[in-house]
Amino acid sequence: MKLFGTDGVRGKAGEKLSAQTAMRLAMAAGIYFRKYSATNVILVGKDTRKSGYMIETAIVAGLTAVGYNVLQIGPMPTPAIAFLTENMRCDAGIMISASHNPYYDNGIKFFDNCGDKIEENIEAEIEKIYYDDEMIANAQKTMTEIGANKRIDDVIGRYIVQIKNSFPKELTLKNLRVVLDVANGAAYKVAPTVFSELGADVIVINDEPNGSNINQSCGALHPEELANEVKRLRADIGFAFDGDADRLVVVDENGEVVHGDAVLGVLATYLNEKKALKGGAVVATVMSNAALEDYLKSHKIKLLRANVGDKYVLEMMKENGINFGGEQSGHVIFNDYAKTGDGLVTSMQVVAMMLKKGKKASEIFKAIKPYPQILLNLKITEKKPLEKIAGLKELEKNLEKDGIRSLFRYSGTENVIRLLLEGKNQNLVEKRMNEVEKFFIKALNA
């Protein structure tokens, strides 16, 4: 059985992701990282899911069993793990989170000693070790060689300093009222602290995690409550994070949710104006709206498209010497400040841009009006290779003739196919989506 998906290992806690699986996976990872070990220390963090305790304990057991020392830092955002792994000179970092998924799911993500998400070839090596009984048995230490673990609570300060350093020193948030929806997740302490220390008038919602309310009708996937609060409190802006705070959704002062591609496009031109956009280009994904491409083109900025997943965006950024990119879902990567999508870094750049321009959020983001786009997540029973689905090529050709861009892809973590249609005529896009949905229901026993 394949362990790794598009973003680490993920599944229902206690089922696909059991304590046994987590412990053995940690042992396999420990065996792999040992080959390049400099400090013999691995950092482990988590979000606020109840199952995080079980998985964390299992991971610590697995790592110490193969001789690794472990630093446990408790609930922290995924980008904090990436930063702290390098900052504290650890051999690797492990984040226990299923990101935006419901509380009953959990996941394990690995970072190398530079704070980068591990590449697919490394995942394959760890997976190979995982299934090698002899290697696992031989790697287990005894007596004095067994590793130790240490729980530390004060590293949050290092990450807060890093986030504040991404905000221009000459600016202050003193006259800004900000509403934060921390999704009962990993940002519940750090996000309010950063904004308060920079002088903002901060109102926080969904900041009482109980182990099972992470992402529950709140945060980046459900910004409705945030939108209402921003309007009610007459705030200047609202920010919604997801469970592990690697993505961000922006709500303007009118309570309107800003399209993710509008956030990307406007931030790109802001960086370009500051002469801080490297490579004269931005990396987005195949899901990004064509309106983003047209907007960037009008500002003489190129758009490159990567596969869906922030690690693929980052790969393409590195290959092309680009320092800015992201996904319309809210993963935005400022490579000068972070190694992965970081909701807090993004929020800092958004408020800095507002202050520098002296404009309201709604005025800034109205520059990009996305073309009508429909994304449908269809539950399926089988993942048949797309190239083997009869009639699909013909369907795609017909959509192209209608001036409709289409993208069909399976989720890497769920039994779902994502159907995307985009065009300039809303009614036509809706009509064609009905036909596409019926086609896939029949083809994939949905």
Swiss-Prot record:
Q: Which GO terms describe its cellular component?
A: cytosol
Which residues, by range, are in coiled-coil regions? none
A GO molecular function annotation here is: phosphoglucosamine mutase activity
Active site as annotated: 99
**Annotated catalysed reactions:** alpha-D-glucosamine 1-phosphate = D-glucosamine 6-phosphate
Q: Which GO terms describe its biological process?
A: carbohydrate metabolic process; peptidoglycan biosynthetic process; UDP-N-acetylglucosamine biosynthetic process
Q: How is the cofactor bound?
A: Binds 1 Mg(2+) ion per subunit.
The Swiss-Prot or TrEMBL record lists the needed cofactor(s) as: Mg(2+)
Q: List ligand-binding residues for Mg(2+).
A: 99, 242, 244, 246
State the function annotated in the UniProt record.
Answer: Catalyzes the conversion of glucosamine-6-phosphate to glucosamine-1-phosphate.
- Protein's name according to its UniProt entry: Phosphoglucosamine mutase
Q: From which organism does this entry originate? A: Campylobacter curvus (strain 525.92)
